[in-house]
Amino acid sequence: MLFEHEGAKFINEYDRHNFPEYLYDQCRIFAELKKEDRTEYLYLPTHELTIKKALKRLGATNTDECSIKLEDKETDNLWFERIQDITATENLYAANNVLRAVERAEKNNELDKLEAVIDFADRYDSASIIKLEDNIDNFRYFDNVYDKEGLGRALIDENDDYYIDEDIEEFFMFEQYAESVMDECDCKFCDNGTVLLEGLTLAEILGEDNQSEEMTMGGM
């Protein structure tokens, strides 16, 4: 309800069914849900229960029954496009869960690493992104490293047991050293750095090995 000045009439913005738009807190993405003549607004990421309540006020049982319009508030273009794709191909719940993973990564100063790990895995569905964020400590990330020589230098710099005197540095074979490490793990040069995965396979992290075993057992 708004009151502009003395003598003006009250304007009732609440129709007793759906709350009006009111951005009372920070959000990453603003979502407008419509069904027939009713409209609800969500400020993502939010609690799953908040989405369910909004759907109930719309008279909908799931997000497929609504038209959804997203507006970027505090995400970069890359993540906004991903959230749009996930909302379209999966649902709003999945997109909301991915935004929670993004918030966790950003809080831990690991958003660049998460983006590189997603590039490494080449998986962009919500379940994969969430599993990759949950297991981000299993990956090694070298920011702004794009080739074998740079990787070799970065690997040596991070190891306190290694030291190369600047007088002989130009003679050290950094590429060959990087190759020896890459032979023992999975490695990919990504758009914003290099990612290494050691000790586990990507399939294990994504839970695909368990799925394969279940399918094999089911076929016996």
Predicted segment positions?
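N-terminal ordered "arm"
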Residues: M1-T63
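Short, hydrophobic/π-rich interface segment
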Residues: L2-F10, A154-E184
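Short, flexible beta-strand-to-coil junctions
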Residues: E32-D37, E71-K73, E198
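Short, surface-exposed beta-strand/loop "edge" segments at domain boundaries and coil↔beta transitions
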Residues: E36-Y41, D76-L78, L202-I205
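Conserved aromatic
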Residues: L44-E48, F142, F171
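Mixed-charge (acidic/basic) macromolecular-recognition segments
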Residues: L55-E170, L206
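Non-Sec secretion/translocation targeting segments of pathogen effectors
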Residues: M173, Q211-M220
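Long, highly charged low-complexity segments enriched in Glu/Asp and Lys/Arg with interspersed Ser/Thr
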Residues: E179-S212
